[in-house]
Amino acid sequence: PTGGGGGKKKPPPPPLAAIQAAQEGYPVFSVSSDVQGSTGIASFQKSFPDRFVEVGIAESNMVSVGAGYAKIGFIPIVDTFGQFGVTKGNLPLTMAALSQAPVIAIFSHVGFQDAADGASHQATTYFAAISSIPHTVVIAPSCSGEAHALMHAAIKRYAEDRQAGRDGESYVFFVGRENYPIHWIDGATYPWGRSQVIREGADVVLVGCGPLLSKAVQAGELLAEKGVSATVISNPFVNRVDLETITPWVEKAQGRVVTIEDHQVVCGMGAQLSHALSDQGTRHQVTTLGIGGGFGQSAYMAEHLYERHGLTAKDMADAAQKLLD
């Protein structure tokens, strides 16, 4: 497999999947808090003007209203920037799960993807904040095809749970701001709950998710130039680790793993992956690249902050090389 995906780039399209699902008859309903143009859900609202409500700059109320729509038979989709979704929305998300009123969330501009707005707007604890809420699935897609497929699958699963009389789960999608490739592998499919092997190797496993999967792909290419064979894995289901896919590659690499994420190292994707591997008894040594306990800064582009915080492809390749030395 090759990284890069080829072709024109476009933003990840969960809203396009919502439009598709509504056209197919699913009772999707949008609840927004002022930034629907930035999150992309405005396209759904334009297509279905009788299927949305705008609550203003009131993210906590947005999630609570969404839970209310769940109780009367809709499939609610709430949207805002990641920072406000995981802070102001945390208690309502917990109450929605407790009340058997799950919601689907699109929380965008995560991590350093919101470079220009500075530290106050940069969500760096989003995995940690949401992953431990019961009955809540955290998803960090890394390409447009994956985002579309998994959002459509989430809506379908929501409807199936309701029809079967099950309580169901909330699905929280964390997406970036800057462009994603359409696919990392041409013709790829995205089965629910599964990771995707982007590149196969034997010496070390590189795991990424969301916007920083690109760094893992590039790191794999840098290592190949040095004769190091790296497996690159996309891990979108952050708190539902796909051990069936990941474990054999970790064992093949004699336990050498490097993870990268646009998130604090503490309680992030890498920490949850390592915990899951340890819990099943898989011996491994992991180096986690992430934000080291500080806040972000204002910058023109996310790339400037990735360089400042050691989250580049070269940083990941160097970390992998250290595990091999």
State where each predicted segment sits.
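Thiamine diphosphate
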Residues: 1-174, 179, 189, 313, ...
